[in-house]
Amino acid sequence: MRNILIKTAVAGFLCLGLASCADDLNISSIDPQSSPSYDADGLLAKQYATLGLTGQAGPAGKGDMSQDEGESGFYRVIFNLQELCTDEVIWAWQTDTDIPAITNIAWNSSSVRANWAYQRLAYDITLHNQFISEQTGKMSDDVIAEVRFLRCLNYYYFLDLFHKAPFKDTFDSELPVEKTGKDLYDWIDKELTAIEPQLKEVGAYNDEKGFGRADRGAAYALHARLALNSAVYTDGQVKDYKKAKDYCDKILSSGAYALSTEAKNGFTGYEQVFMGDNDQNTQAMKEIIFPIRQDGKKTQEYSGSTYLVASMRISGMPNSFTSNYWSCNFARKDLVEKFFPKDNIPMAGENDALKDATEEQVIAKDEELKVTTKDVINKAGDDRAMFYMGVGGGIRTLSPGKQSTGFTNGASIVKWQNRHADGSDIHDGIFMDTDIPLFRLAEIYLTRAEANYRLGNTTDALADIQTIQKRANRKEISGAVDEQTLIDEWCREFYVEGRRRSDLIRFGLFSGSKYLWDFKGGVAGGIGIESKFNVYPIPVTDIAGNPNMTQNPNY
């Protein structure tokens, strides 16, 4: 962490109530041994910009770090390590850097992608430490608490991904120390407890002016997520399920948030949460507790929602509302089967292929064949089945066989959209407007359901699951709640939202052979894997540069 070059120039950003801070400040790089002059409000904007931007010059150039700027953004590094190794998605371009190792769960201590995540988190924390150190006593306690929350968030992902962190809560030239497992869990727990009373009240920033800033609701949501995973993070020493439930109760009883339930212009309540105007649509905003702000004009990057939308589309797909097609992430069969256990998803066949078709012709053909996304949703009986299996971009299959490459070897996922629910124009054709809901109310319902289940309160768990299913227009379960019910519901509600690996680990399904999926362990159909893969390795470069850090077991 000591050797990371910290650059604090603030690019144009959705300023989260900090409108005067949006200009480029052209501040020099920070040397831990010096105290350069800078605009404090601009530095606050940069704290939030670490979530949604990668540098000071738009999508590429003057990057925060020396590695591939498009690959180095906060959400993209988290998403890739949480999703590409699971039963949800496959990256089509298996010759890309480190992708086969992630797809097949065969990484080692030289993993480039694990290193990218490690360096991003370390960079962000260093920046937050600098702000907290220099602005405490100068700026209000609630603002300092916001940045302390962001620091907790980054340490949370260190704990989740690596089971340890190079830990510092000061800004100086000393090397970080290693904080592992329960010690790191306890620190995050105590730090969140300390800052929660200092933050603005629950829902204070759930409006157009403050949307994207952290209030007490964001801290409660992170605290609930931390506590739900307590047994994993502390190696079974702590099981804070009651605490997880209590923090969910605080959020739900506040009345500050609500699930997005009402259809609008043909878009379901669920769909609107992931659309390009989810920062203007009051119904979508009410569900979102803490977003990563995105805008096609003001936050141009390749690591946020631009990554989510572009990577899941191929040229020729209708209703894309972007000209940016990467043809990368497609659904594994195992994800589709959470909605279609009999593999009966509506889909076009080889004889239905069109050549050089216009978008209008593709739409007409899909409607004729009854293979539109709406047809898929209707067949699934679940608004969350946001898949495309039509003729646009090529004919898709569900079974890639022994091949994990090729974008049409699985269903296309259209959950993330640049389209605006109100019909207004998109802001840009290349970069997306869609804010990323890092915490949303549906997570609070399912967290409380799982916490209640683990506490033996199955009736209460059932009620919260039914609430989520009702919003999705899915037939509500009525029988006993079990672990399979819970893990499947987590998948249906939160697929491709950057959390699947954590959920599988919590249920004991990621490593071992209890649950197999295509290409788990590098084999079509899947094989069991070692438990060491429940955490990522510490980069060898950090161990070489910091004698305080040790490698995770068996790497």
Annotate each PLM feature.
Residues 97-108, 112-116, 340-440:
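Flexible, polar/acidic helix-loop-strand segments at domain edges
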Residues 41-45, 49-54, 89-162, 174-186, ...:
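Conserved, well-structured interaction surfaces
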Residues 21-75, 545-555:
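Membrane-proximal, proline-rich intrinsically disordered regions
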Residues 159-161, 166, 203, 229-236, ...:
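Short coil/turn linking the two alpha-helices of tandem helical-hairpin repeats
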Residues 20-24, 37-40, 121-122, 187-189, ...:
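Long, intrinsically disordered, low-complexity segments
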